C-alpha cells in the first residue's frame, strides 16, 4: 500500500504538514507506516469495536458501552482511566503489539474508515459499534479540539476549518464518505449503527439496542438501573458548565455558524449526501 505526502495550500503550514495521504485519505502522522499492519491485525470473535469519525461522541459512547458490557457504574468509570481499557487501534500508545496481547474480551476503538479497518472485521469476525453525529455539531467540536492541541494545533479561523471539512481535507478524510461507508453495512449482523443525537432523544432504546447487540441479558430491574446509570453518564458528559460552550449538546452549531456558512454547508451536505437515506437531527 503506497503512501504519498499531501499538500494543500490555503491553510496554516504547521497544521498542514503534519498529515499524509494514504489511498486518497488524509491521515494523522501516527498512522504512517502502520496501515498494512492494521489491515492484517488479528481480531477475535469476542472483540467489541467502537468506530467513529473524530468528535462523534466517542468518549461518551465508550463509557456507555463499558457500563453495559462490564456492569460497571458511573462512579467506578469516573475513577478509572477508561482510555487504557479501550485503546485506539492506530494511536502510538499502547501500540498494536500490546493491543494484540490484551486479554479477552477486548474493547478497541478506531477512527479509521471502514475500508482501512482490519480485514477480519469485514468478514464479520467481531462486533462493531459505529456512531455518527450530525456534521454541524461535529465540525464545531473538531475545531475546538484542534485549537486545544499542542502538537497539532490549528491556528486558522473556524470558517477556514469548516471549509476544510466540507472539502474533505481534515484528518481521517471525508466525514461524508466515512459515515456512508458504515451506513452501507448497517444491516451486517456484526454491525450496530448508532447516532449521537439518539443518546439525548431516546437513551432507553439505545441502551436496549446495545444490550441486545452485546448479548447482555438482564431483568427489568437491572435494565432500569443500567439506564439510570447511562443517564448519569450522559448528564456528566454534556454538562454545559463542565465543557467549553456546552460541547456535548445537540444544536451547538447554531451558536457558531453564520447564516452564510449554514447555507454553504447545507449545499455541500445535499451534494455529498443526496443519494444516501441516512438522516440526522441537527437540533432537538
From Swiss-Prot:
One of its GO terms (biological process) is sulfur compound metabolic process. Keywords: Cytoplasm, Lipid metabolism, Phosphoprotein, Steroid metabolism, Transferase. Its EC number is 2.8.2.-. GO terms for cellular component: cytoplasm; cytosol; mitochondrion. One of its GO terms (molecular function) is identical protein binding. Transmembrane segments: none annotated. Atypical sulfotransferase family member with very low affinity for 3'-phospho-5'-adenylyl sulfate (PAPS) and very low catalytic activity towards L-triiodothyronine, thyroxine, estrone, p-nitrophenol, 2-naphthylamine, and 2-beta-naphthol. May have a role in the metabolism of drugs and neurotransmitters in the CNS. It is found in: Cytoplasm. Expressed in the brain, not detected in the liver, kidney, spleen, heart, small intestine or testis. It comes from Rattus norvegicus. Belongs to the sulfotransferase 1 family. The modification Phosphothreonine is found at residues 8, 11, 205. This is Sulfotransferase 4A1. InterPro entries: P-loop_NTPase (IPR027417), Sulfotransferase_dom (IPR000863).
Amino acid at each position: 500500500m503506497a503512501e504519498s505526502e499531501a499538500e494543500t495550500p490555503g491553510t496554516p503550514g504547521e497544521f498542514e504538514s503534519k498529515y499524509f495521504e494514504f489511498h486518497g485519505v488524509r491521515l494523522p502522522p501516527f498512522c504512517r507506516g502502520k496501515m498494512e499492519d492494521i489491515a492484517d491485525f488479528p481480531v477475535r470473535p469476542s472483540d467489541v469495536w467502537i468506530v467513529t469519525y473524530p468528535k462523534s461522541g466517542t468518549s461518551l459512547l465508550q463509557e456507555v458501552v463499558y457500563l453495559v458490557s462490564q456492569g460497571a457504574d458511573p462512579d467506578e468509570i469516573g475513577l478509572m482511566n477508561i482510555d487504557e481499557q479501550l485503546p485506539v487501534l492506530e494511536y502510538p500508545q499502547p501500540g498494536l503489539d500490546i493491543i494484540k496481547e490484551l486479554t479477552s474480551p477486548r474493547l478497541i476503538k478506531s477512527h479509521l474508515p471502514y475500508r482501512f479497518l482490519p480485514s477480519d472485521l469485514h468478514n464479520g469476525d467481531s462486533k462493531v459499534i459505529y456512531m455518527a453525529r450530525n456534521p454541524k455539531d461535529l465540525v464545531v467540536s473538531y475545531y475546538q479540539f484542534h485549537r486545544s492541541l499542542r502538537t497539532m494545533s490549528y491556528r486558522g479561523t473556524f470558517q477556514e476549518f469548516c471549509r476544510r471539512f466540507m472539502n474533505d481535507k481534515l484528518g481521517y478524510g471525508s466525514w461524508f464518505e466515512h459515515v456512508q461507508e458504515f451506513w452501507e453495512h448497517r444491516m451486517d449482523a456484526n454491525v450496530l449503527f448508532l447516532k449521537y443525537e439518539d443518546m439525548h432523544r431516546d437513551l432507553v432504546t439505545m441502551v436496549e439496542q446495545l444490550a441486545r447487540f452485546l448479548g447482555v441479558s438482564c431483568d427489568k430491574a437491572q435494565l432500569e438501573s443500567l439506564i439510570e446509570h447511562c443517564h448519569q453518564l450522559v448528564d456528566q458528559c454534556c454538562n454545559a458548565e463542565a465543557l467549553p460552550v456546552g460541547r456535548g449538546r445537540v444544536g451547538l452549531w447554531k451558536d457558531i455558524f453564520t447564516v452564510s456558512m449554514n447555507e454553504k454547508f447545507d449545499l455541500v451536505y445535499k451534494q455529498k449526501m443526496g443519494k444516501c437515506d441516512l438522516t440526522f437531527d441537527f437540533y432537538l
